[in-house]
Amino acid sequence: MSDQERETEEDEGGDPSDTAPMLPQRLPDHQASDLMSPGWASLAARGLGTLLFQGWALARLLLHLLLPAAVFLLVLLPAAAVVYLGFLCHSRVHPAPRPACRALLSDRGSAAVIVLGFLSLPPLLVLASAARARLARRLHSLLPPPTWSPGPHRQSDGEKQLCAWV
């Protein structure tokens, strides 16, 4: 820009920044290499570590929730199926039961199947609890114990303190 053009611009109230390039200039090579310095790598590693830690915590939470649900569902499914079959074939639930139900079960038979299904629930609950405890013991590294447990606690001086619930 010549001196005369600058004077004209200043007279018109133009700012020299109006003629500045809109895009930033390319970084020199030594500044571009700063982006790949060990500081950036450690920052990226810390960020990745934080994401992995939160992902691991989420996986443990899902395992805590889904493991008992899956075990109890699988173990209690036969009892639920028997109860459903009993209700499906009973004439008071369905006024006109299917011919296959009539051939297999009368109303008394359907009631007996319903009672059998409900009576099989407690032993199956015990079996499901035992299976869940065994799986939790095997997966102990993935399922750490809870941080708080009720019962007597040791004080720092070795005395026992009993927590009473009111």
Curated annotation (Swiss-Prot):
Region (Disordered): 1-28
Xref: InterPro entries: TMEM88 (IPR033355)
Membrane spanning stretches: 39-59, 65-85, 111-131
Keywords attached to this entry: Membrane, Transmembrane, Transmembrane helix
Bias-annotated ranges (Acidic residues): 1-15
Subcellular location(s) of the protein: Membrane
Name of the protein: Transmembrane protein 278
